[in-house]
A protein has these predicted regions:
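Structured alpha/beta or helical-core interaction and ligand-binding surfaces enriched in interleaved
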Residues: 1-5, 33-35, 52
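A common structural junction motif
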Residues: 26-29, 88-96
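Short, conserved charged micro-motifs
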Residues: 15-20, 77-83
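Terminal, regulation- and interaction-focused segments at domain boundaries
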Residues: 1-25
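Intrinsically disordered, low-complexity regulatory segments enriched in Ser/Thr/Pro
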Residues: 55-76
Length: 97
């Protein structure tokens, strides 16, 4: 059995954006106050959690929301963790210009 593995990502998103964006991974949007979701992956799971941080002000004009989003993998191999992380990153990727 694989020991739990946790990774953290500093992200710029609100709780509402997190709840909406995670929907393709969970099969539906999270409820209004939910800050984490457990996602079944093969014979294991991933707990994805949102932890808000103070926003940062850019150029005195714009406040950017910040949060630590953690992924805690239970019972997954390195290959499975890598595949899920790639899917997570793609799901949360935003267009730039």
């Amino acid at each position: 059995m694989h020991e739990p593995v946790r990774i953290e990502k500093l992200m710029s998103l609100t709780l509402r954006e997190f709840q909406y964006t995670i929907a393709p991974l969970t099969g539906g949007a999270l409820g209004a106050e939910r800050t984490e979701a457990e996602i079944r992956v093969g014979s294991g799971s991933v707990v994805v959690a949102y932890d808000p941080r103070p926003s940062v002000r850019l150029g005195g004009l714009i406040d950017m929301p910040r949060a630590i989003v953690s992924l805690t993998f239970h019972g997954l191999s390195q290959t499975e963790r890598d595949a899920f992380t790639k899917r997570f990153d793609f799901t949360f990727q935003r267009g730039g210009g």
